[in-house]
Regions:
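C-terminal beta-strand-loop-alpha-helix "lid" module of Rossmann-like NAD(P)-dependent dehydrogenases
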Residues: 1-289
């Protein structure tokens, strides 16, 4: 009996050690990827912040982009950015919860909401709930590039100016540090002056030629593309950070479980030895008697 128990425990130890090797490897991979992702995010933020300064000045001049008026229901497009893969803790769960909240809030006001998903997790989530995304993009979130941003945003901006949608909103995870990432939403179009003002203090002193309106029409595509690209980079960096933490926690849990199972193995081995000694002593006494 003790021998059978010992074999079971040892098999579990072997299995947990194998799992630990995998989680440790995934932790190291995520750790290496996050460094590169942070560098790309920092570079992107410099460009995005400059565009934000200019847009703030333009919107402050009274020039605001608008969607053609639509009678009746207002149309909202939510761009939900998740990952293609799991094993990233609550990363995807937090985003999808927020997306559901935003969708519900808009629908409760009588608006029509369309979903654009980035990442397999978002696509699978909404399809499972009988919500067919208008468009789905996969294979982007690991290492997004500017072409991905153009691919996502260009048709949406066209729809905005054609009156097919009145508002474009991103739902994604903002990277703050390796330990802190926050799920949030951000309106891309129409511009929200207060939101832009909070993001960065206006430097002032711009003179627009030939007019603020013409400059704005030229800069809107750059601004919207930079905004979605920044969101993709934030999401990617946050995903790597979340996966690194999740795999680190899994590795530590595996180490703790191995310690517990090793103690159980030692106890089972001691019990087996004690039983064998008792059987030998008992047999010797029987022969002597």
């Amino acid at each position: 009996m003790a021998s059978a128990e010992l074999r079971i425990i040892n098999r579990r130890i072997k299995s947990v050690k194998s799992t630990k090797k995998i989680t440790r490897a995934m932790e190291l991979i995520a750790s290496s990827r996050i460094v590169k992702a942070q560098q790309r995010l920092t570079s992107s933020n410099n460009y995005t912040n400059l565009l934000t300064q200019i847009v703030e000045e333009l919107t402050g001049s009274g020039e605001m982009p608008t969607s053609p008026a639509i009678e009746g229901t207002k149309k909202i497009t939510l761009v939900v950015i998740t990952s293609d893969r799991g094993l990233a803790g609550a990363y995807n769960t937090n985003i999808l919860k927020l997306a559901e909240i935003r969708k519900g809030e808009y629908e409760n006001l009588g608006n029509q909401v369309e979903i654009v998903t980035v990442g397999k997790k978002a696509n699978g989530y909404f399809k499972y709930r009988n919500v067919e995304p208008k468009q789905n993009y996969e294979g982007i979130t690991d290492e997004p590039n500017f072409e991905n941003a153009l691919q996502i945003m260009t048709p949406l901006v066209e729809e905005f100016y054609e009156g097919k949608t009145n508002q474009i909103e991103l739902v994604y995870t903002e990277y703050q540090s390796a330990m802190t990432q926050t799920a949030l939403y951000k309106t891309v179009l129409p511009f929200e002056v207060e939101q832009i003002a909070k993001e960065i203090e206006s430097v002032g002193g711009y003179t627009f030629e030939p007019s603020a309106s013409q400059v704005l029409s030229n800069i809107i595509p750059k601004y919207t593309n930079a905004t979605i690209f920044s969101a993709l980079l934030n999401a990617s960096t946050s995903e790597h950070a979340a996966r690194m933490r999740a795999m680190k926690a899994a590795t530590e849990n595996a180490e703790e479980l191995i310690k517990i199972l090793s103690r159980q193995s030692n106890q089972a081995r001691q019990a087996e030895i004690t039983t064998e000694i008792s059987e030998i002593v008992g047999g010797a006494e029987a022969l002597a008697g």
